[in-house]
């Protein structure tokens, strides 16, 4: 996301939560976690500036920001977190990071949730591309794979967003509708009722 001009205000893991209002450097976070196994200790002066300050989990989920990406744990965002979140969009990078009750609260608060079924399906898609290359005995470059992935993910998001608008529902509900309609088409082609 850095390459698109976005800055990471905060990050958290089992070792704690860290914030820097000027933005955290992903490369430094990666280096620290590789060396220490968690974010624990990733704060204070380093490299000639303050990398970040430790914050509590409650502060983390109440930060005013555009996007929150829960990318590690299931049920990370429950009712309490949902009540206090100050973001426009949640992109589910993990499987099931938002509980059902939290999802309802976020819906009532007009916070858009890009569901896991849509947001984190890239790995499965790339596995399919790998299978396809092996099946066809061809080799794509990394750029080819990323281009295909970007195109497919954008197309799926566009279709799901259109369904959400058409049915006046959430992106999660629209993802399920899209999936069921896709299965229905296959059944119809095969003559299955």
Where are these regions (language model features)?
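Rossmann-fold NAD(P) dinucleotide-binding segment
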Residues: 55-65, 73-90
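Structural motif
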Residues: 7-10, 66-67, 88-90, 111-112
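Short helix/loop capping segments that flank catalytic or ligand/cofactor-binding pockets
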Residues: 19-21, 78, 100
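Adenosine-phosphate binding glycine-rich loop
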Residues: 83, 87-193
């Amino acid at each position: 996301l850095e390459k698109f001009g976005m800055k990471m205000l905060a990050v958290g893991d089992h070792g704690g939560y860290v914030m820097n209002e000027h933005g955290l450097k992903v490369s430094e976070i990666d280096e620290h976690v590789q060396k220490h196994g968690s974010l624990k200790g990733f704060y204070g002066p380093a490299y000639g500036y303050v990398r970040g300050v430790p914050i509590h989990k409650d502060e983390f989920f109440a930060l005013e920001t555009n996007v929150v990406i829960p990318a590690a744990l299931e049920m990370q965002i429950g009712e309490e977190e949902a009540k206090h979140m100050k973001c426009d969009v949640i992109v589910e990078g993990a499987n099931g990071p938002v509980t059902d009750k939290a999802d309802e609260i976020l819906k009532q608060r007009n916070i858009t949730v890009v569901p896991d079924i849509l947001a984190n399906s890239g790995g499965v898609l790339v596995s399919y591309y790998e299978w396809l290359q092996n099946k066809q005995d061809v080799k794509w470059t990394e750029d080819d794979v990323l281009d295909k992935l970007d195109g497919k993910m954008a197309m799926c998001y566009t279709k799901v967003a259109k369904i959400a608008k058409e049915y006046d529902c959430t992106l999660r509900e629209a993802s399920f509708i899209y999936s069921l309609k896709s299965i229905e088409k296959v059944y119809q082609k095969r003559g299955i009722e």
